[in-house]
């Protein structure tokens, strides 16, 4: 990407490091970034909207600092007369320092700069900054914006000061903090990363495979696939051009795109749109949906008014197993994802409320069809209250287009409901819990009180329910006493209660509160 010579002269001074700038490790960076939220605390900006302002500012500062760094290197190598080439164009007047030096109407200057950068980099950045209303002075007065700009200006976010993995992790840290701050709203955009890791590790994407998340939120599933390959010693660059996501919320889709870019992933497709009503990724050669090696999602639980009227004559053939009711889109998501799996090695992982395992009616019929077609490979029941915004217990379903011979006409059913760490307002699936669940799935064998391989014939006898307690009995607690001891303890407690009642009655009578 090329810049005009005029751009260099207006922005070159910003390459010099300021005396007060911080050289970051990850903890320093994360702490400084979260302090930006404290600047907004008590302002007219609702905490549910903090991410709409802070995350774009972080991304804006990062690309400007990298631009400055690249420019300084070229000047040092070639002098002032050279054709400048950058990853992203920063048009004249749209640099961070231009906005920082604006004396008034700062929001207007900022919004104009962000839109100019998007327009100059349409292939990669168009719409990436979202739709935050920077010009609303009632919410964002000049003084507040200047405080935010100065706070971020203390950071040098060029590559020589902070690597892409560190700034990417810091961005993920901010997303997690915003999720914690908003809780109920967070379920719309954030999946706990231990759950992401478990799902990705089960699917085990390989270098060069295509990955698709039809409800991609902030991009955690796609990043998880890249990290999985990196951890296995593969080259994550083989995923360039092979990561796909669709997200209905504009701000969340923008956050996902910034997230991938800050992690150094340059070539991907995150599209905004309603997946169930208007899927973006299609295949003109077949006239159907595009298909992918790995399909992975945590869609909204039991979504109402999800688009049933479209599916009554769905042009993409997604209602192949049945048409779900308008009150719950759970099996609409499942059928969309099944339709999006590639032939051969296509596989998928989806998070659903556990009610999807046993609800009857049309959902029971769809579940029966999926089982009879031998698509469901594994069911994992999770602990309650792991996800933001709901205390419901969830499950993970693993489906595969073509099971290996050893798994045909069988389903591995896992009860992981006891694996969690209890928190004050939410439970947590820690890495050690996810690792244990993964081992059960990979070993694919019975584990006492935890996992069981169930034949389809047995599931048919249970009327096609996948209710986990029908197949895996919860472990009997070791602290349950023998029957005789329990009866004796009960009698003692009963006698103690009667004696306490008599003492209370005597005291109240003596005090005149009760008549004799």
Predicted feature residues:
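A conserved structural/catalytic subdomain of Rossmann-like adenosyl-cofactor enzymes
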Residues: 2, 6, 16-17, 284-516
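Charged, amphipathic alpha-helical interaction segments
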Residues: 61, 175, 219, 230, ...
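Non-catalytic, mostly N-terminal accessory regions of nucleic-acid modification and defense proteins
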Residues: 1-207, 269-280, 381-385, 407-417, ...
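Conserved S-adenosyl-L-methionine
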Residues: 185-297, 302-313, 317, 331-332, ...
